[in-house]
Curated annotation (Swiss-Prot):
Active site, per annotation: C50
BP terms from Gene Ontology: protoporphyrinogen IX biosynthetic process from glutamate
Protein name: Glutamyl-tRNA reductase
Other known facts: During catalysis, the active site Cys acts as a nucleophile attacking the alpha-carbonyl group of tRNA-bound glutamate with the formation of a thioester intermediate between enzyme and glutamate, and the concomitant release of tRNA(Glu). The thioester intermediate is finally reduced by direct hydride transfer from NADPH, to form the product GSA.
Domain of life: Bacteria
Enzyme kind, highest EC tier: oxidoreductase
GO molecular function, one term: glutamyl-tRNA reductase activity
Pathway given in the UniProt record: Porphyrin-containing compound metabolism; protoporphyrin-IX biosynthesis; 5-aminolevulinate from L-glutamyl-tRNA(Glu): step 1/2
Spans traversing the lipid bilayer: none
Family, per entry: Belongs to the glutamyl-tRNA reductase family.
Entry-linked Pfam families: GlutR_dimer (PF00745), GlutR_N (PF05201), Shikimate_DH (PF01488)
Subunit structure: Homodimer.
Gene coding for it: hemA
Catalytic reactions of this protein: (S)-4-amino-5-oxopentanoate + tRNA(Glu) + NADP(+) = L-glutamyl-tRNA(Glu) + NADPH + H(+)
Amino acid sequence: MSVLLVGVSHRTAPVPVLERVAVTDTDRPKLTDKLLASSHISEAMIVSTCNRVEIYAVVDAFHGALAEVGELLADHSGLDLTDLHRHAYVRYSEAAAEHLFAVASGLDSMVIGEQQILGQIRTAYASSDAQQAAGRTLHELAQQALRVGKRVHSETGIDSAGASVVSVALDRAAGIVGAGGLTGRTAVVVGAGSMGGLSVAHLTRAGIGRIVVVNRTRERAEHLADTARSNGVAAEALELAELPDAMAQADVLVTCTGAVGAVVTLADTHRALAQPGRDSERPLVICDLGLPRDVEPAVSGLPGVTVLDMESLQRDPAAGAAASDADAARTIVAAELANYLAGQRLAEVTPTVTALRQRAADVVEAELMRLDSRLPGLDDPERDEVARTVRRVVDKLLHAPTVRVKQLASAPGGDSYAAALRELFELSPGSVEAVAKPTELGGADLGAIDITDGFIAGQDPRLRRFVADDNRGKESQA
């Protein structure tokens, strides 16, 4: 069983495509169930953020699982497979682990070094675990990815600038609202999730004068408003129906709800701008960080309104971390990946070693029983000494090869040594819980498959280009 990754991100797709493939909190359990119902998938985890959707699946057949994931993603998004393949990327086995480690470290983010992705991976993992969709393989992969991300952020300066999509959007908003930036102004935050919390924190640090938190439930909005008040900022909590009134007071509005359909409509915005007492020359900057987008497209055409959405941020991304910090992060990722893969290979050979030792123990017991029948006159002390001697001999004979096979198996290509051990000692498949190679690959190395031009021979033409070529693979992890 190996891990297959199929994803779409800001590096490979425009925002309209990302909107189509976006997986909301409501969608995630349903799509996970569909993945688990597939014939080649035993575990599944879906990472969904404002600029990426990635499906991690533990599969027993590469080609079959790739077809199933592709078709499910196409069905979910409403995109044709031929459209989807132009924007999707595929990673398999070791490459899938490497990609997740890089993502968790903030190396693949639109703003290099941002920390929010760690929480988003944690959410994806928790959701998968809650649905019992994560088995041993995904548990180990996700937990290791979170550890790698934490290590990168604690041992490098990759996040020293404190940049995130929220901070980049609000920094740009500060330059639009006029002299003094955000200091003393009024901001409306729509949504009380993680992005809302991050927005409140950044606005507080920026010296905002007042924050209005708007949410479907007032209770969650009140919690964020309390956070702002505890930091000395005047704050108010409102329900979503009161959004137009809140907008009438705003200089900046930040929204990221994950809702399907517009939350900030043209009619509501027009009504807010027309409220008595609002200066017609007063600009309103709306930061739409939702995916799908929360703001109706026509809103950007209103006089005095500037909409900063993921598409505009994607066109002009922030610099993020310094090159030296990013290089240090990549070094950590490479080292942690090597350790993780060595551990995975060792885990695969351990059942073989256990089965070999059990086979030896069975042989010893059988021979001792034969000895009892041939020399019935042996007293107990003599028999015990013979048994101890035979077991010591067997242990000494097995010690060197079992230690050595573990060492060899932890290196790339080491699974062949475990296979040789099983062949030499005729260990039956039933006695060894070895991880099987994907059946459709017939145990072959992926390197033997021609993917240099993005195709896998023999596949449905609509699916072939899901497999990324070498250059694209490098770009996605740059």
